[in-house]
Amino acid sequence: MGKEYLKPTVFISGHRDLTQEEFDLYYGMQLDWLIIQEEIEFVIGDYDGCDTMAQEYLTEQGFDPSRVTIYHMGDKPMNLVNKRFKTIGGFKNDIERDSAMTNASTYDVAYIRKGKENSGTAQNILRRFTF
C-alpha cells in the first residue's frame, strides 16, 4: 500500500543562528515562488533562527495562515509569530518532531552551511531519502 496523497507541503528548516542575510539569500526567492502556488502548505518548527524567520516571512507576505502548521515539543510553541497558524505539539525531542514534519511534507526548503553537514537541518534532508 502506498503513501496516501499529501497536498504539496514544504518543510522549511535551517540553522538556529541563521542571519537575516542568509535567510534572504537562501530562502527568500524559493518562498516567493512557492507562496504563489495554489495548494501549497508549509510545516515549520518553533525555534529561533530559520523557523522564526520563516514564520515572520510568510506572515509579512500575507500567506494564508491556515496553510501553515508549526510543530513543537511540549505543550506550546516557543515561537509562534501568527496565532492563526495551526500547531501540532507534544513531541519528546527534536528527532521525533522533525521526523513528523518530514512525514507530513513532500518537499524541503533548507540551507546547510559548509562544515555543518551533520546538523539537524542536514539530517532533515537525509531523512526524506531513507523512507
PLM regions: where:
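Acidic/glycine-enriched connector segments
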Residues: 2-8, 16-131
